[in-house]
Amino acid sequence: MALRDSKIADTSQSNGFESDNCADGADVQPYTTATFSNITFVGPKVLDANFQNDPDYITAGAYNPNNGSALGKFQAAMQIRRSSHLNCINSVALGWPVGLIVDGEKGGTVQASKDGLFKLQNVYFAGMDAVGSDANKIYKDKLYDAVNKKFIDESQKSYSNTFFFSQPGNKYFDSWSSLVGLDGYTPIAGSPLLGVASFTGWNGFDNVSYIGAFDGSNNWMSGWTNFDPQNTQY
């Protein structure tokens, strides 16, 4: 599970996954080809009804060291770029500004997605401002040329949106409230996340029936995780 403080974001934009093959985007082996399954990304909007993706709001609050450290904005649940071939299956992302960026600024990531060299399958998004964006720091779900830094056609959805919905089992929900409870990550009774996972064609995983990190009845974090370490007396 990935859970972020809504008032702390990286100066270079905060993402759930930010996957590169190499810094300059070179389309060379060995490729980044990790495969992730059953991830739950809890975005900044889920547990903060007042969230604003703005530097005036993202101040780090009481945890700001006041040493000049720069903060930034939240961006995407998944940014796959620079020739990465990262795969993700049976996972859910909730309440991010952007769901997916297949970033074509450097390298061959866009072409790799078209050639089926990486896959996003049985991935559910909910409560995004934009399902997809085609470039870093572009928050519009519009078809965009990341190399030449211009919109191709603002009447069309982003390529990232098109790719997301072309993949088997992917779905989008307007709100996460039909998926998870008030804690932001546990599936509620009857949640669409339950009973729909698929591992067909994927090896090396314990096959479970649910999408995301939790099955709705067993919170494996209980007893050993702490969400308030600053105020805990050890």
Give the role of each language-model region:
Residues 1-234:
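Extracellular beta-rich repeat passengers
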